[in-house]
């Protein structure tokens, strides 16, 4: 239920799952404290004027992997970053205002990071799903 509505009242959850409101409150509090659960707001980036969403694949010099990943993960426009297997060593999902900003971002930010050998961009043309739920 919290995946659908992170602000769902404890009373509604308790009623739906058949336990007391205090039980729900205690369990949610424990899951938050133990980092099993985090309640966040997910912005609609397009409505906020950020129309350019880009997946960036990077090939990196192996001995620079951790440094490059750390540097890129500290850039505000990078929404998620993952070290991977396959043709690319790192994938970064970047959200920008427009394609002009993408060019500036690549030239002034990504290309300046030492250790990156190859960069390939995959511009999002049409987002079909944006599901942050976890299958349980």
Model-derived regions, located:
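A compositional/biophysical signature of low hydrophobicity enriched in polar/charged and small residues
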Residues: 1-136
């Amino acid at each position: 239920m919290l995946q659908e509505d992170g602000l769902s009242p404890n009373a509604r959850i308790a009623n739906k799952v058949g336990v007391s409101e205090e039980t729900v409150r205690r369990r949610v509090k424990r899951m938050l404290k133990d980092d099993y659960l985090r309640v966040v707001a997910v912005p609609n980036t397009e409505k906020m004027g950020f129309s350019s969403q880009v997946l960036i694949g990077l090939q990196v010099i192996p001995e620079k992997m951790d440094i490059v990943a750390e540097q890129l993960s500290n850039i505000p426009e990078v929404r998620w970053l993952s070290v991977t297997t396959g043709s690319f060593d790192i994938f970064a999902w970047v959200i920008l205002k427009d394609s002009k900003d993408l060019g500036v971002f690549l030239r002034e930010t990504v290309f300046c990071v030492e250790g990156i050998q190859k960069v390939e961009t995959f511009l999002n043309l049409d987002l079909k799903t944006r599901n942050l739920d976890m299958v349980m």
